[in-house]
């Protein structure tokens, strides 16, 4: 089975990576798909986010990382995907994922959704919260990988 784990990953967190690692255990092939939205540019470019994730999952042989723009369902169809993986942190995530599930099923009935609950230590972790903590000089250890922390500090210093 080929699955896709889509997101912005700006930057990728240990919560994201936990979901990816767990999903890779039950998929033949997992595609981490970095959403590149020109209308809403992130701190990191799509290429930078792809590179940071590739460094983070290099020990997972069945995981690949790509960027995409446009509808995720169209990208998933092109990649032969049959399952969307999403991580759920808090209740608001469930509502948002349900909305997306209904729309994705309308666009392509052949793609299913699998939601994985975040591990407890990542329940309230978000990329935007991490950016704020690092920008204000806080410690990001245990929240993002060391190479991501270095890239984030460098990016914020040059912004």
UniProtKB/Swiss-Prot annotation:
<feature type="binding site">
    <location>
        <position position="16"/>
    </location>
    <ligand>
        <name>ATP</name>
    </ligand>
</feature>
<dbReference type="GO" id="GO:0005737">
    <property type="term" value="C:cytoplasm"/>
</dbReference>
<keyword id="KW-0963">Cytoplasm</keyword>
<comment type="pathway">
    <text>Cofactor biosynthesis; coenzyme A biosynthesis; CoA from (R)-pantothenate: step 4/5.</text>
</comment>
<keyword id="KW-0173">Coenzyme A biosynthesis</keyword>
<protein>
    <recommendedName>
        <fullName>Phosphopantetheine adenylyltransferase</fullName>
        <ecNumber>2.7.7.3</ecNumber>
    </recommendedName>
</protein>
<dbReference type="InterPro" id="IPR004821">
    <property type="entry name" value="Cyt_trans-like"/>
</dbReference>
<dbReference type="InterPro" id="IPR014729">
    <property type="entry name" value="Rossmann-like_a/b/a_fold"/>
</dbReference>
<feature type="site" description="Transition state stabilizer">
    <location>
        <position position="16"/>
    </location>
</feature>
<keyword id="KW-0808">Transferase</keyword>
<dbReference type="GO" id="GO:0004595">
    <property type="term" value="F:pantetheine-phosphate adenylyltransferase activity"/>
</dbReference>
<dbReference type="InterPro" id="IPR001980">
    <property type="entry name" value="PPAT"/>
</dbReference>
<dbReference type="GO" id="GO:0005524">
    <property type="term" value="F:ATP binding"/>
</dbReference>
<feature type="binding site">
    <location>
        <begin position="122"/>
        <end position="128"/>
    </location>
    <ligand>
        <name>ATP</name>
    </ligand>
</feature>
<feature type="binding site">
    <location>
        <position position="72"/>
    </location>
    <ligand>
        <name>substrate</name>
    </ligand>
</feature>
<feature type="binding site">
    <location>
        <position position="97"/>
    </location>
    <ligand>
        <name>ATP</name>
    </ligand>
</feature>
<comment type="similarity">
    <text>Belongs to the bacterial CoaD family.</text>
</comment>
<keyword id="KW-0547">Nucleotide-binding</keyword>
<keyword id="KW-0067">ATP-binding</keyword>
<feature type="binding site">
    <location>
        <position position="40"/>
    </location>
    <ligand>
        <name>substrate</name>
    </ligand>
</feature>
<feature type="binding site">
    <location>
        <position position="86"/>
    </location>
    <ligand>
        <name>substrate</name>
    </ligand>
</feature>
<comment type="function">
    <text>Reversibly transfers an adenylyl group from ATP to 4'-phosphopantetheine, yielding dephospho-CoA (dPCoA) and pyrophosphate.</text>
</comment>
<keyword id="KW-0460">Magnesium</keyword>
<feature type="binding site">
    <location>
        <begin position="87"/>
        <end position="89"/>
    </location>
    <ligand>
        <name>ATP</name>
    </ligand>
</feature>
<dbReference type="Pfam" id="PF01467">
    <property type="entry name" value="CTP_transf_like"/>
</dbReference>
<comment type="subunit">
    <text>Homohexamer.</text>
</comment>
<keyword id="KW-0548">Nucleotidyltransferase</keyword>
<dbReference type="GO" id="GO:0015937">
    <property type="term" value="P:coenzyme A biosynthetic process"/>
</dbReference>
